[in-house]
Amino acid sequence: MFVLETEEDFGRVAAQTAKQVIMQGIREAERERVLSEYGDKEGTVVNGTIQKIDRGNVIIEFGRATGMLSKKEQIPGEFYKQGARIKAYLYSVEEGARGINLWLSRTHPQFLLELFAIEAPEVANEVVELKAIAREPGARSKVAVWSNDEGIDPIGSLVGQRGVRAIAFSSTTS
């Protein structure tokens, strides 16, 4: 680093170089912030807003970061509208040439597990365990459950009173 003596030392080229160095530093800091923020969220369900739909791929915005829900990770027959809120499973955070890539899925088997942990506190507290999940995305899902507490009905805790939890869960996945 050097110190400029007078204002005459500030030429057009020097000003542009300084601007580029500052902008590069800002971009690097932004990349690091996004990587640290979303690297911790890898393997969880995230909420976002649909920004645009490009050739079947859905671009989802999460504040200062965007993620990609590719066509193969979408539930068949599901339609997406720009501006709609959506939940998706963040299965990969990668550093690419053009920034941080967030890869999302709505068909991943872990998506169901994470949704159950959100909807049913018994699953989050590990009182009820999900032993196995079989899923045909968009059609049906089967879940084998087990209770670690004899006083808690594992099926009832996931279905909820009058099916309230099952309805909320079903509306999220289809």
Locations of regions flagged by a protein language model:
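RNA-contacting regions in translation and RNA-metabolism proteins
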Residues: 1-174
